[in-house]
A protein has these predicted regions:
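A broadly conserved sequence feature marking short terminus-proximal activation segments
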Residues: 1-10, 23-56
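Local cysteine-cluster metal-coordination motifs and their immediate loop/turn environment
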Residues: 15-37, 80-92
Length: 173
């Protein structure tokens, strides 16, 4: 687990997550609506830091980004959790799952994932997709910074329900 950004203390052992407009007030030992940001003794932690539920190389058009490096591939990665509960979600198995076994799952470092993306010659970078990437914010930002430093492109397929961005390619999966 990694300490989450965008939080404030409400009272002892109770904090507010300010990442998305839900602004969840989370008591000690509990999680927010996304199920992946948990309060432990007054601090909110990202339970899924480094945990990848799905990965693969996809045509960029599958994101769907049709005018962003057309004909190229991008390394798509996702984790668990979402800050919405859409009835039509095509990836509900990972976006709405609440695994209690995160600690037993394989963890990846940002370096490992960026290296995997770099191995394929026709790959332009990394896309954060499958579940809602905003709930994985700290890990996503660590990967994106490293990928950008190596000349890779980054993309985010999101529901757009986050306090920090003014624009995005919004899709409801």
């Amino acid at each position: 687990m990694k300490i989450a950004r965008y939080q404030e203390t409400i009272q002892r052992y109770q904090s507010r997550c300010n990442l998305c407009p839900h602004n969840c007030v989370i008591a000690d030992g509990k999680s927010g609506r996304c199920h992946v940001r948990e309060n432990s003794e007054g601090d909110i932690y990202l339970k899924t830091y480094g945990i990848v539920s799905s990965m693969g190389f996809d045509p960029i058009e599958k994101k769907p980004l049709y005018h962003f490096h057309p004909g190229k591939y991008i390394f798509s990665i996702g984790s668990f959790g979402c800050n919405l509960k859409c009835r039509f979600c095509q990836n509900w198995e990972i976006s709405q799952s609440v695994p209690d076994h995160y600690s037993k799952m394989k963890h990846f470092s940002p370096e490992e994932l960026v290296s995997m993306a770099a191995e394929r010659r026709d790959n332009i970078g990394i896309a954060f997709t499958y579940n809602e990437p905003a709930v994985w914010f700290e890990f996503m930002m660590d990967i994106a910074a490293l990928a950008k430093s190596r000349g890779m492109k980054t993309a985010m397929v999101t529901n757009g329900f986050i306090n920090l961005f003014n624009g995005a390619n919004v899709t409801l999966k």
